Curated annotation (Swiss-Prot):
This is Transcription factor MYB74. The keyword Cell inner membrane does not apply. Residues 10-62, 63-117 form the HTH myb-type domain. Pfam families: Myb_DNA-binding (PF00249). The lineage of its organism: Eukaryota, Viridiplantae, Streptophyta, Embryophyta, Tracheophyta. CDD domains: SANT (cd00167). Seeds over-expressing MYB74 display hypersensitivity to salt stress during seed germination. PROSITE patterns: HTH_MYB. Gene3D superfamilies: Homeodomain-like. It is found in: Nucleus.
Length: 324
């Protein structure tokens, strides 16, 4: 036979939106007496409403513990888990979400969660993966945008997505792990060219900084090291007017070639100590100065190159120092 209606279809019962005066009457009565029996409450509270209307008004709008605002991720997880067990029993789901009403949960499910599950390839009715529903392009475009503009926010979304993949011990994972692997693979391939470009830029910057980072001592400092150099007026006769050492070895693309020029003036002695852009010139114990022109080469190439050129580009300073 079923349950009888909460109220008879009587003339004089008001329908439609509630007025502030009616809301206040309902609040005052429940605060004093409690809601008790919803069938008799309207008459006792002096309201021209049916019991169901009073119950819905109180439950969905007037009770003080109603939580307003957006649903948290934990609440979304709970709704999805409970819906997979109970289906569309919104009142039962709302009873397990403090502060949320069944009507609010139902509306949020239809406007947000259901659409999100469809984009993730999850059937919102059976909660099983369906590849024909998966919208990978939407997931990737959203992830790429968040990664380039809001890295921290994207990291939070990634953590939330990972939590959707994990089981809580009582239920199956909400999203098939294979779907996550596919989306992650595509997302990594999408980001790989950018990462490669950034790494190349950083490497080139480091090479440039290393090449220009070695500062050659100034002329005044060199003159203080070799104060007697100014006395040798015929010092230019001891060396060629201009010597160019050019490294012709072939290296990798990220290596550079060094050119060194000894200018025809030697009073400041700076040109004799010209150094390569990426490594300082060693001054050995026998006071012989070697001009080193290899950069970014292996040890074997350096040894071979030095053995061929060390006799050609060295001179003895001891002869000069004896005049002192």
């Amino acid at each position: 036979m079923g349950r009888s209606p909460c109220c008879e279809k009587k003339n004089g019962l008001k329908k439609g939106p509630w007025t502030p005066e009616e809301d206040q009457k309902l609040i005052d009565y429940i605060n004093i007496h409690g809601y008790g029996n919803w069938r008799t409450l309207p008459k006792n509270a002096g309201l021209q409403r049916c019991g169901k209307s009073c119950r819905l008004r109180w439950t969905n709008y007037l009770r003080p513990d109603i939580k307003r605002g957006r649903f948290s991720f934990e609440e979304e997880e709970t709704i999805i888990q409970l819906h997979s067990i109970m289906g569309n029993k919104w009142s039962a789901i709302a009873a397990r979400l403090p502060g949320r009403t069944d009507n609010e949960i139902k509306n949020y499910w239809n406007t947000h969660i259901r659409k999100r599950l469809l984009k993730m390839g999850i059937d919102p009715v059976t909660h099983t993966p369906r590849l024909d529903l998966l919208d990978i392009s939407s997931i990737l475009s959203s992830s790429i945008y968040n990664s380039s503009h809001h890295h921290h926010h994207h990291h939070q979304q990634h953590m939330n997505m990972s939590r959707l993949m994990m089981s809580d011990g009582n239920h199956q994972p909400l999203v098939n792990p294979e779907i996550l692997k596919l989306a992650t693979s595509l997302f990594s391939n999408q980001n790989h060219p950018n990462n490669t470009h950034e790494n190349n830029t950083v490497n080139q910057t480091e090479v440039n900084q290393y090449q220009t980072g070695y500062n050659m001592p100034g002329n005044e400092e060199l003159q203080s090291w070799f104060p007697i150099m100014d006395q040798f007026t015929n010092f230019q006769d001891l060396m060629p007017m201009k010597t160019t050492v050019q490294n012709s070895l072939s290296y990798d693309d990220d290596c550079s070639k060094s050119n060194f020029v000894l200018e025809p003036y030697y009073s400041d002695f700076a040109s004799v100590l010209t150094t390569p852009s990426s490594s300082p010139t060693p001054l050995n114990s026998s006071s012989s100065t070697y001009i080193n022109s290899s950069t970014c080469s292996t040890e074997d190439e350096k040894e071979s190159y030095y053995s061929d050129n060390i006799t050609n580009y060295s001179f003895d300073v001891n002869g000069f120092l004896q005049f002192q």
